[in-house]
Regions:
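Short conserved segments within the C-terminal catalytic ATPase subdomain
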Residues: 89-99
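Short beta-strand/loop element within the Bergerat-fold HATPase_c
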Residues: 133-147
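Short conserved segment of the HATPase_c
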Residues: 160-172
Length: 228
């Protein structure tokens, strides 16, 4: 297992080199490309980066020692950061992105949370509606009665059939032919659920065929020690 983890880490390190070179090229030679080519190249880069991150996090989830760093995170601002990281994917699909709620703070690991957000955004792009302007909305609320922060991420995409909903977090599950998940590898939502479990974030999905999908992330209540 240790050799496997080491191999994955080294492989990811090596593939990030051409991705970094690609980023440098896209930044420095933008004027030499047509806007369409530049946008498409950004899309390819970000899509490749997401696939690499999936492999990396899949290997890390099975590790004995995990280097999570829990800190206060402004949830809405972190969502905006994740959108910025995936902007080329969203722009290529002509997405409308909106936000609501207060910028509540929750305790979590930023890298792990950003990975979750990236996978959810990627799914929204992959299964965007074709008969309307694709849209994704981030909403944060603070349930003061139970001390929990709730983040809802809603899109207006193709949705998930009711028969598939109980299995969307199963490893390798891709749904029926033509469904929301049929074009996927069956790993994205599995990794999201595993990462959420590690970070003690409760995750729920509500969806209807052609009715969009809502992912709800509930952050745990953290008891703060009283000052002396």
């Amino acid at each position: 297992v240790a050799n496997y983890e080491s191999y994955i880490e080294n492989w990811v390190h090596e593939i990030k080199k051409p991705l970094s070179l690609m980023t440098l090229l896209l930044d420095n030679r933008k004027d030499e490309m047509s806007p369409l080519v530049h946008t498409r190249m950004l899309y390819v880069r970000d899509h490749t980066r997401q696939n690499v991150e999936q492999i990396l996090y899949f290997s890390r989830l099975g590790a004995v020692h995990k280097d999570y760093y829990f800190e206060p995170l402004p949830i809405l601002e972190t969502c905006k950061e994740a959108v910025e990281d995936n902007l080329s994917l969203l722009e290529e699909a002509h997405f409308s992105v909106t936000y609501s709620g207060n910028n509540c703070t929750a305790i979590s690991d930023k890298k792990g949370f950003m990975f979750i957000l990236g996978q959810i955004i990627s799914n929204s792009v992959k299964y965007a509606a074709h008969d309307a302007t694709p849209a994704i909305h981030f909403s944060v609320s603070d349930n003061k009665e139970i001390g929990q922060i709730v983040l809802s991420i809603c899109d207006n995409g193709t949705g998930i059939p009711a028969s598939d909903l109980p299995f969307v977090f199963d490893k390798g599950f891709t749904g029926d032919v033509g469904s929301y998940l049929s074009r996927s590898t069956g790993m994205g939502l599995y990794l999201v659920q595993q990462m959420a479990s590690d970070l003690t974030i409760k995750i729920d999905i509500h969806s209807n065929t052609n009715g969009g999908t809502t992912v709800i992330l509930t952050f745990p209540k953290v008891e703060r020690p009283l000052g002396r």
